[in-house]
Amino acid sequence: MDTLPFGLFEPAYRKGITGAALVVRGVLYFRNGYTPTVRKALVQCFEQYAAMVDEYHHALEVAAGQKPSKEGPLRWFYTEGKQPMAYEKAPAFERLATSTPGDTSLVATMTSADHKLATGFYDFSVFALGEWKATHNRGLDTLVFTVPRAFLEQRPGKFQALFTAMCEALPIVHGHAGYGVNLPPMELNANEASEYFYARRYGPGIDVGDPMGYSTVMLEGAIKTVDWIVALNADLVRAAGGADSLTLPPDWYVRQPFGDGGLIVQAGVAPQASVSAGPGKPPLPPPAYVLLDSALRPIIAEKMDILQSGTLDSTAPLLNTTIATEAWLKRFVLQPDQLTEQWRELHKTPTVGSSKAAVGANLSRFRKIMGLPEPVRSNGFGYDGGSPG
């Protein structure tokens, strides 16, 4: 059940289109999105995303016995102050990114939705503040990209490699990737209950809340959540106690250095929503996420504004109070004596070793195509699998 109908839990808003889609989502928070250098990097990130999902989309068509279409999966284009446009008739993202003045916010979303008010499995969104707002602490810039869950199995290593390449291309502050829920760009509120339904049904490893929400982009010196993959700049790595203080066993955690002291941590070989607690019991958090949360607890936000709003008519459960939001932020927190059991459970899960080569090969290719600087020296625990030094 990877999609839900529009307004499923909001009878007054129901439509016969898709209102929520369970996906694998990457989110990056960065600075200086008003500068030509970063705008150019954003274009490169989009071009690699588009090429990656186009190839996959066409391969699925061939596998289904269809003739490959000329278009990729993206169908709709949204930008600030304008009505949604059919993607093939919209201005290219490159044109928008390079023509939008630096003192004006760059806002764009491209989705694979079948209808302009719906959502789909593919989404690429950018919100980059204009110079005045960016230099007056009005929040971080945001890039979001998503793929269907099956993509990870059918294109091993590509998602992680693109996420890492984007971290190297942009002046990121932090980021995360894992399971999330795409909602319609123009109709978030009527479908937020569906997002929270997924998290309650499948488990705490599913992210909740708009990645571009005000309370999230305004976080200072903290991150909203751990996830399958977490990226931290050097300041946040230091605030967490330093890379050497992270007692994360390399058989289950990738630690990929980037930039000047930044670190990307991958928890487990694949994203997880939960682990089963048995019939009739609520799902338990994945051990790899619990232990990463414990390691990064000094920099994880304990308070935020509400993560969801819903509609005026909402009666379904939502994270629309500060109490519910704060409980969600601490959903991976366990008592110290319970953490010991999580280490034992972690050792029952697949190790990351055999998956790193595919990521490393794809990352090398992305770096070459995007013209990224030489990577920092290996620490022996990253995707390259090399020895330190």
Predicted segments with their positions:
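C-terminal interaction module
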Residues: 1-66, 185-389
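Internal, hydrophobic cores of structured domains that mediate oligomerization or house catalytic pockets
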Residues: 65-199
